[in-house]
Amino acid sequence: MTTALDQLKQYTTVVADTGDFQQLAQYKPQDATTNPSLILKAVQKDAYKPILEKTVRDHRNESTDFIIDRLLIAFGTEILKLIPGRVSTEVDARLSFDTQRSIDKGRELIKLYEAAGIGRERILIKLASTWEGIRAAQVLQQEGIKCNMTLLFSLVQAAACAEAGAQLISPFVGRIYDWYKKQAGADWDEAKDGGANDPGVQSVRRIYTYYKTFGYHTEVMGASFRTTSQIIELAGCDLLTISPDLLQKLQDSNDPVERKLSPDALHDKPTERVAIDEASFRFQLNDDAMATEKLAEGIRVFAADAVKLEKLIAALR
């Protein structure tokens, strides 16, 4: 029997969402994604502490920021030894509202990868999908630095990223699901509100349809999954980035997987493009309580984990 994971790979590029790169080989993903929380989690495991310790030891007299950049590249370099495709490395979330510093950090990370002998075609720089992050991506893309727009929860963010020429977006399925489930409280009915009706799944489907309808080349990579059901409902999406625990569940399953998204079978096609000048973007984002709250929360969580990583480094100096 063909596993659900192998079936999914027929329709979608499978990406591993982890800093724990020793798990990669068994799932054979094309690409991999990391974020501050995943790197923080990894460096606290015995298997990866030596990478953190060596990076601090080699650059003991440099700034903490300098050391973190080298740590990100160390993880990215190891990951790229195990996959054929690209790795995503994230810009510090504390730069989410600073276009110029985000541009500078993106350039610096690419420079470090290239110094390690890795071509920029194998790297995606992750930026928060704020107005400022999207403007940074526009500049970086024009320089041949490909960007993965993260913390994306709404069509207006997706539309702005596509107009800016971003290589790829990461709409967060699970966090959208979490918000609506919490809002519904006791009224939430998983049988009725999950599956194809899952609000996170519907959000990605809407974005995918918008992109294909208007001919955007920005790749759509569903992210932040809570269940294999959410993944199966998005079979056919350009890419899906999946945590090792859910990759394992897909590998253990022989349930049939059918293509749910296809550029040749679009439903509920939009008739107009979303207005995305700065004022329109900010108003539409503000008008979406879920997207506003989850974007702010996501930035806070990633920023807090960056601070925790700094403290780990300080303790090793």
Swiss-Prot record:
Concerning PROSITE patterns, the annotation shows: TRANSALDOLASE_1, TRANSALDOLASE_2
Where is it mainly found?
A: cytoplasm
Q: Does the keyword Lyase apply?
A: no
Q: Looking at the keywords, is Transferase present?
A: yes
The leader peptide range reads: none
A cellular component annotation (GO) from this entry: cytoplasm
NCBIfam families to which the protein is assigned, alphabetical: PRK12346.1, talAB
Provide the family line: Belongs to the transaldolase family. Type 1 subfamily.
User: Quaternary state and partners of this protein?
Assistant: Homodimer.
Protein name as it appears in the record: Transaldolase
Name the source organism: Burkholderia vietnamiensis (strain G4 / LMG 22486) (Burkholderia cepacia (strain R1808))
Q: What is the lineage of its organism?
A: Bacteria, Pseudomonadati, Pseudomonadota, Betaproteobacteria, Burkholderiales
